[in-house]
Amino acid sequence: MQVEILATGDELLTGQVVDTNSPWLMDRLWDLGLMVRRKTLVADDRDDLRAAILETTARADLVVMSGGMGPTEDDLTSECVAAVLGVPLERHEPSIEVLRERFRKFGRALTPNNEKQAWFPRGAEVIPNRWGSAPGFTVPVGRGRVVCLPGVPVEYRGLCEEWVLPHVGARLSEVPAAGLVKLFAVPESHADHAMRPVMDDPANAGVRFGYRAHWPETHVKWTVPGPDAAGRAARIRERVLGIFGEQVFGEGKDELPDLVVARLAARGERVALGESCTGGMVAELLTAVPGASAVLDLGVVAYANAAKERVLGVPAELLAAHGAVSEPVARALAEGARRAGGAAWGVGITGIAGPSGGTPEKPVGTVHLAVAGPSGTETVARAYRGDRDRVRRQAAYEALNLLRLALR
């Protein structure tokens, strides 16, 4: 099956909005063994949009289109698909009623421009939208089918999960087995080099391997077709886990903060945080996870030296002798947070996020991290690159990973 993606919207071409829908769908289709062959971006222009619909549907069995489904003058998708088919737009009464009820709940009357969202090319199958006001639709065009979806990410992804992916899966002669392992802070090139024996193994002929690097994660993926796909995928997984060991922090949809919360909860333990340069980012990452209240005791942003002394008990002489950005102070922050919270674990972070404040001995990007636990305190020093935000985020995720390793 040949699949293409067509996204429309001036905002995507002016840089005002980044298209996150297409990469998400590409990733989901990869799990079905399909690689999207082309992605096309088109402005809100009738001529360009009609031409793009004709071009993509001439090549692909399925074109997934996003955007242009709303109530405004520049929402042109339904109109342009109808023009390509040479059919009129027709009012879809069930969608009108859904819109009326939606507006009624907000105490508003349905306006004529919003009714535009319920007009579709004659013969189209309407796809109800439980996440927003604009339904999607699908209709045969060219050699295959076009599916038109709203561009709002939560709506797009919901409709893909509910309609597009099941539609694709039902038309595949076989669904391959897939695997995904997530590595912490492993460069993509290193992962590729380490994976060469697996990729070059004749037993893995026909297996599609892929990588995705987005700091602090590098994803290693594989899709296995054919007979015994599940068994072959499982054997690859065992080899990958053996190659990377503790650098593997999760699989599939695992996220680092979720795993840390889950491990703490499974042990019945809590953590306390003593943050400086990260300004509460570690606490933010943890509290975004449902159930964090059971494992997070306290989070202190001790930015000034006086606060480090007063709140977390960092000795003044330690600060004077080593400076705020140092291994002893990171250790004291972690131990002070653990003591203040009465928690099993304490995390301490101190660093220079920049852009100023660095010295030849301690350049911008220098960060010291510590994890204090029942068996003592472990510390690490890091030299991060990037702007202020990137340094802080790297440090926050590094702290979570150190805690993950301590909880193993």
Curated annotation (Swiss-Prot):
Gene3D superfamilies: CinA-like, MoaB/Mog-like domain. CDD domains: cinA. It comes from the Bacteria. SUPFAM superfamilies: CinA-like (SSF142433), Molybdenum cofactor biosynthesis proteins (SSF53218). Pfam families: CinA, MoCF_biosynth. Coiled coil: none annotated. PANTHER family: NICOTINAMIDE-NUCLEOTIDE AMIDOHYDROLASE PNCC, NMN AMIDOHYDROLASE-LIKE PROTEIN YFAY. Belongs to the CinA family. This is CinA-like protein. It comes from Anaeromyxobacter dehalogenans (strain 2CP-1 / ATCC BAA-258).
